[in-house]
Regions:
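Juxtamembrane transmembrane-helix boundary motif
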Residues: 3-41, 48, 52-69, 85-169, ...
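Alpha-helical transmembrane segments of polytopic membrane transporters and translocases
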Residues: 73-77, 203-206
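A structural-propensity feature for long, helix-poor, extended segments
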Residues: 79-83
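Conserved, well-structured core segments that form the ligand-binding/active-site neighborhood
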Residues: 177
Length: 287
């Protein structure tokens, strides 16, 4: 049985989660799953990690609002590790389009800072969540339809990629995901091969994660009711266990990417996008 203890440090009331075998097993299984998804689809597993970490924390005494914020921040922090592991595997196969990643990166960093340093702390995100769900659902539908992009359609110039990168970083920071839910459909729409889009998206996950984590630490440093073992909004025990397990399975997912047919990969990714869209729509409508 898992226990929740309350620890008082000065005027601060902290939740102390005892790390017992069941909790370790829960977090380890979550890490193995999200790591495989990171390698397979270029995602950091945020759509899986955020709801489950929220459930784990809220069931142990954390308020719903705090649990969601810490789940988002902890999810994003693990992406720093899963992205490195999966990108290495993709790079060894020559799948990462570094020329595209370098053009995306400046906008991604700016958008991530705007989201994590400002909007994350202030915005409930009801209307944004609904818009986001509709956008992701549309992207998933386009992938399932497999409508061929115009032969002449190409990626936009540096200004266009900067702006779209800022949008990716901004939205990623609000949901704790690595950005593949937007960047992969966008790149395939612009005639980037699916496997290259997945690999490049995995590379983009690292700057997204680093910039957002900095913001989460800064904005969370003065919050008074964080659980013991927190660094800003990041729950370090969960980060350590999930990250350790996820780096083990990320290379397996990356190898599966290069073994699966592109059509199957698109359907798998679209299915995950629908799950994320449904969850975000629920969060938006529930207020």
């Amino acid at each position: 049985m898992l226990h929740v203890a309350l620890c008082r440090t000065g005027a601060t009331l902290k939740l102390s989660f005892m790390i017992e075998p069941l909790l370790i097993a829960e977090l380890a299984l979550l890490g193995l799953t999200t790591g495989f998804l990171a390698g397979l689809l270029g995602v950091g597993g945020g759509m899986v990690m955020v709801p489950f970490v929220t459930l784990i924390m809220s069931s142990r005494g954390a308020s719903s609002g705090l649990a969601v914020k810490m789940a988002i921040a902890t999810s994003m922090a693990t992406i720093m590790f899963t992205s490195i592991s999966s990108v290495r595997a993709h790079h060894q196969r020559g799948a990462v389009r570094w020329d595209i990643a370098k053009r995306f990166a400046p906008g991604i960093v700016l958008g991530s800072f705007i989201g994590s340093l400002g909007v994350f702390a202030l915005l409930k995100g009801t209307y944004l969540a609904i818009f986001f769900a509709l956008f992701v659902g549309f992207s998933a539908t386009q992938m399932i339809r497999d409508k061929k992009p115009a032969a002449a359609r190409q990626l936009p110039g540096n200004a266009g990629l900067f702006g779209f990168g800022a949008l990716i970083g901004f939205l990623s920071g609000l949901v704790g995901a690595g950005g593949a839910f937007i960047s992969v459909p966008f790149m395939t729409w612009c005639n980037v091969h699916m496997r290259n889009a997945v690999a490049t998206s995995a590379a983009l996950g690292f700057p997204i994660a680093v910039a957002n984590v900095i913001g989460y630490v800064i904005t969370g440093r003065h919050v008074m009711d964080l659980p013991a073992g927190s660094f800003g909004y990041i729950w370090l025990p969960a980060l350590g266990i999930i990250a350790l397990c996820s780096v083990l399975t990320a290379p397996l997912g990356a190898r599966a990417t290069h073994a699966l047919p592109v059509a199957v990969l698109k359907k798998v990714f679209a299915s995950i996008l629908y799950v994320l869209a449904t969850y975000m729509l629920y969060r938006g409508l529930a207020g």
